[in-house]
Amino acid sequence: MDQTQHPSKAAQPLRSEKTRHCDGFRIFLAALSFSYICKALGGVIMKSSITQIERRFDIPSSISGLIDGGFEIGNLLVIVFVSYFGSKLHRPKLIGTGCFIMGIGSILTALPHFFMGYYRYATENDISSLHNSTLTCLVNQTTSLTGTSPEIMEKGCEKGSNSYTWIYVLMGNMLRGIGETPIVPLGVSYIDDFAKEGNSSMYLGTLHTIAMIGPILGFIMSSVFAKLYVDVGYVDLRSVRITPQDARWVGAWWLGFIVNGLLCIICSIPFFFLPKIPKRSQKERKNSASLHVLKTDEDKNPVTNPTTQEKQAPANLTGFLWSLRSILTNEQYVIFLILTLLQISSFIGSFTYLFKFIEQQFGQTASQANFLLGVITIPTMASGMFLGGYLIKRLKLTLLGITKFVFFTTTMAYVFYLSYFLLICENKAFAGLTLTYDGMNPVDSHIDVPLSYCNSDCICDKNQWEPVCGENGVTYISPCLAGCKSFRGDKKLMNIEFYDCSCVSGSGFQKGNHSARLGECPRDKCKTKYYFYITFQVIISFFTALGSTSLMLILIRSVQPELKSLGMGFHSLVVRTLGGILAPVYYGALIDRTCMKWSVTSCGARGACRLYNSRLFGMIYVGLSIALKTPILLLYVALIYVMKRKMKRNDNKILENGRKFTDEGNPEPVNNNGYSCVPSDEKNSETPL
């Protein structure tokens, strides 16, 4: 065969056998599947660790929401570069670089753990010596202990000068967002360009199915790591007197990011050995060469036509502005844009604080919440997505039919979500916050609850948080505020029991030597509601996933074919900015307003929340999601109306063209698909529905 026809063949023998092995489309698919698993794994680990990060860094929910939104911030920083230059560069290597950056970002997120020092769940005076602390009620003492002593606070502040180390977590999450950006668009375009004709959809479906392994692994890993104490391997775990049920417990949140970071770096390696264009069959090479010969010299060397180059820049700018105006004046596109923005905002905001909601409402640990959501919810969503795609194909739904189907599934999920209002639990019986200190009467406000007769003689530190559960089922902020005079326990401060608690004996009990034990009282009354919650969560996840597979199809069919890329890009920009970044922040800010007891940092500043008003938390969490979901249903009705009106307008055009052809002697004006054989005169006409 003539060498001039295949100039690349002369260089082929120079390739090493190792490179030949990597010159395959299947290897790219396998590596891309691995990267999908890694990026989904990292996302779930971040969401699952939000509460742990709040406690470890002593930050409110609004700051943790900003940290969570850092992923979208990083994504937006490079999305324009990736969208424009990605297809022109070496796509596999660019994806590999993204995976490597994603791994570095994940490791950076965990880095503060190694230089912050040990986690202190109690103040310095609590852990120094139990005999010299303010744990028990000190009667007739001259020293006032209504607050932490300045000496101890200054000492602790010097040790804990890590007030802004959470910024490293934010930067790490931003790096994860930067690294994730090229994976999906370049991976999908690579498959679409080089897969055999008709196989692209099968490959993409398989890819998304395999990606579901990531969330399942993420939930299981988070469940295991949440049981481990944050400083595991550094401290004697027998000396840790708090349990995962305690509001101060911090699990080994950093382990998940280390594991995910290493996996991301490993999955980046194969991409660097893949070619820019995969090895193809000889037939495909011949077709490619034939197409190459058909190119004109002007196409190959645009410099030879300077007039075209001079006119290109202003023409591109004018074309871009016209295209942007076209999609923003497209009412079908704008309605769908607002609709999906509300959907994404509701989903991201509620999912970010889902684990906190379960912990505060039903008294479940982070480990239990992660395990149940991973084992039950994710498989349910996977089956819903598969069934949704099957039903649409089986029923051969049109675009209008698909929109009605999604409207039905969204309505069903909305109805079941309303039932969450019935599952909101009442506040804990907490003396000094929801009840008077004697545990007998509710209080109107949790701010500055006055001392009772049972502990008015005690000299207590009100900033101290060492909750104890009395025999009466009431939780007290500390043994001192429970009026406990003595205690019994081992030297490691484990299984301590306090006695002669005057406030416990005043709660409808006979006077006597009543006791209290370390830790909050369990919320047994909410266990039944928790099982109902899990059931409704599975149903809601199923209906949500059932209709989610069609959202992208509605989007790309709402604009003209030549504006598809711009429409998808603008949609992604708006949704990521207003949904992915802002939703966790305003969800967190509203949740912060329900806090009844804040921790106090070593420097005396406000830290993380110890206890929320459960009822108010539930009303805001569920109510905010309902407030975002309600307009969605109205917008779906408007979208269906606009689609029907557009279909009617298209039908009228077909009839007019039919009469025109009939007048000219053409008896069959319409093709088999029901559309006119002659293109419409209107340049701005949309894709037929």
From Swiss-Prot:
Ranges per topology, Cytoplasmic: 1-26, 87-92, 193-211, 276-326, 393-396, 557-565, 644-689
Q: Which SUPFAM superfamilies does UniProt cross-reference here? A: Kazal-type serine protease inhibitors (SSF100895), MFS general substrate transporter (SSF103473)
Q: Which InterPro entries match?
A: Kazal_dom, Kazal_dom_sf, MFS_dom, MFS_trans_sf, OATP
Look up the domain of life of the source. Eukaryota
- One GO term of the biological process aspect: response to peptide hormone
Q: Which GO terms describe its molecular function?
A: bile acid transmembrane transporter activity; oligopeptide transmembrane transporter activity; organic anion transmembrane transporter activity
Query: Transmembrane residues, as ranges?
Result: 27-46, 66-86, 93-117, 164-192, 212-232, 251-275, 327-348, 369-392, 397-420, 534-556, 566-591, 626-643
What ranges does the record list as Basic and acidic residues composition bias? 680-689
Identify its membrane topology class: Multi-pass membrane protein
Query: Which GO cellular component terms are attached?
Result: basolateral plasma membrane; plasma membrane
- The answer, when asked if Transport is one of the entry's keywords, is yes
Does the keyword field hold Transmembrane? yes
Where does the Kazal-like domain lie? 448-505
Signal sequence: where?
A: none
Catalysed reaction(s) here are:
estrone 3-sulfate(out) = estrone 3-sulfate(in); taurocholate(out) = taurocholate(in); prostaglandin E2(out) = prostaglandin E2(in); L-thyroxine(out) = L-thyroxine(in)
The disulfide bridges present are: C454-C484, C460-C480, C469-C503
Where is it expressed, tissue-wise? Answer: Liver specific.
Where in the sequence is Phosphothreonine found?
A: T662
Location relative to the cell: Cell membrane
Which sites does the entry annotate for glycosylation? N132, N140, N513
Q: Per the record, which residues fall in region Disordered?
A: 658-689
Chain ranges on the Extracellular side, renumbered to this chain: 47-65, 118-163, 233-250, 349-368, 421-533, 592-625
Q: Say what the protein does.
A: Mediates the Na(+)-independent uptake of organic anions such as taurochlate, bromosulfophthalein and steroid conjugates (estrone 3-sulfate, 17-beta-glucuronosyl estradiol, dehydroepiandrosterone sulfate). Also transports prostaglandin E2 and L-thyroxine (T4). Shows a pH-sensitive substrate specificity which may be ascribed to the protonation state of the binding site and leads to a stimulation of substrate transport in an acidic microenvironment. Hydrogencarbonate/HCO3(-) acts as the probable counteranion that exchanges for organic anions.
Q: Which family does it belong to?
A: Belongs to the organo anion transporter (TC 2.A.60) family.
Its UniProt domain note says: A conserved histidine residue in the third TMD (His-113) may play an essential role in the pH sensitivity of SLCO1B2/OATP1B2-mediated substrate transport.
Q: What is this protein called?
A: Solute carrier organic anion transporter family member 1B2
